[in-house]
Amino acid sequence: MTKSELIERLAGQQSHIPAKVVEDAVKEMLEQMATTLASGDRIEIRGFGSFSLHYRAPRVGRNPKTGEKVELEGKYVPHFKPGKELRDRANIYG
């Protein structure tokens, strides 16, 4: 599901709320989540999961075109850990 599909689905379920308001709310929620992660804080949504930053250590990579070794710097990457309720719901299909 894409962001626009999510907005469309939510707007369809909440017909008393204008689609533009739903779109603005979704965009603001995602912006707040991104800002929180960028500041190094963790986000926990009980029953759904948590978002945090994980450190990826420096390593030696390869340029896929030339095969040349390239030094890659360490960096923080977003990480999502699903909550138990989400894992259980997903396992219905697995």
UniProtKB/Swiss-Prot annotation:
GO terms for biological process: DNA recombination; regulation of DNA-templated transcription; regulation of translation. GO terms for molecular function: DNA binding; structural constituent of chromatin. GO terms for cellular component: chromosome; cytosol. InterPro entries: Hist_DNA-bd, Histone-like_DNA-bd_CS, IHF-like_DNA-bd_dom_sf, IHF_beta. Gene3D superfamilies: IHF-like DNA-binding proteins (4.10.520.10). Keywords: DNA recombination, DNA-binding, Transcription, Transcription regulation, Translation regulation. SMART domains: BHL. This protein is one of the two subunits of integration host factor, a specific DNA-binding protein that functions in genetic recombination as well as in transcriptional and translational control. HAMAP family: IHF_beta (MF_00381). Heterodimer of an alpha and a beta chain. Belongs to the bacterial histone-like protein family. This is Integration host factor subunit beta. The gene is ihfB.
